[in-house]
């Protein structure tokens, strides 16, 4: 296959090759939320279930809907390859408070915080309706705030504030504390990106 979109397809091809060498038993020991029927892994991301054939690496949406975009599929492969189950300790952390957060804060701010602020803070009612459709848990923070189950034991919260004549719209994203150990910093950025894109698709 000729690679045309290097930014998205080259990383996917890299992790696809690693995926084919996986030991399914080792994956199930690390990730008890993941299923395996001998032919495919089953995992759930933001309420949608997907199958990934092994070792073929063919993705299927179990609800019959559209497949997630390539960066999301890459994230799911990295989850299977590298993540592990870490219990939620009951605390919430900003991106900056977690390991390597300071180093990645600039791309994170642009891709996640600013994008969330201007995507949802300018359309708070639509954001609320989308979050409700996704089964998110409402929070008593911000002009609107919701908690989402991302994958396995990992959860995220988004709070948005509507802009006015004096202040631009604003947003805050919090991660369950187990992200600090369960995901690399770059995957935490991607997780925020995926959450925003998924909410937006329901608006």
Where do the protein language model's features map onto the residues?
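Ampiphathic alpha-helical segments that act as solvent-exposed interaction surfaces
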Residues: 67-89, 176-203
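Short, charged/polar micro-motifs that form catalytic or ligand-binding hotspots
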Residues: 62, 66, 117, 144, ...
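Short Lys/Arg-enriched alpha/beta "domain-start" segment
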Residues: 1-39, 72, 80-134
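Intrinsically disordered, low-complexity regulatory segments enriched in Ser/Thr/Pro
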Residues: 48-74, 161-186
């Amino acid at each position: 296959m000729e690679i045309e979109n290097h930014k998205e397809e080259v990383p996917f091809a890299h992790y696809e090759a690693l995926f084919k060498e996986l030991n399914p038993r080792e994956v199930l020991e690390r990730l008890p939320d993941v299923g395996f029927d001998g032919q495919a892994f089953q995992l759930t991301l933001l309420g949608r279930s997907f199958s990934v054939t092994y070792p073929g690496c063919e993705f299927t949406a179990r609800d019959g809907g559209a497949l997630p975009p390539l960066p999301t599929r890459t994230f799911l492969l990295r989850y299977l390859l590298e993540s592990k189950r870490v219990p939620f300790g009951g605390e919430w952390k900003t991106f900056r408070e977690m390991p390597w957060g300071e180093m990645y804060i600039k791309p994170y701010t642009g891709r996640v915080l600013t994008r969330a602020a201007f995507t949802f803070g300018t359309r708070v009612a639509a954001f609320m309706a989308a979050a409700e459709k996704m089964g998110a848990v409402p929070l008593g923070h911000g002009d609107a705030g919701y908690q989402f189950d991302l994958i396995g034991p990992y959860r995220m919260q988004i709070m948005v504030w509507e802009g006015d004549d004096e202040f631009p719209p604003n947003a805050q994203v919090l991660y369950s504390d187990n992200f600090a150990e369960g995901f690399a910093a770059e995957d935490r950025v991607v997780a925020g990106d995926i959450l925003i894109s998924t909410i937006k698709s329901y608006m």
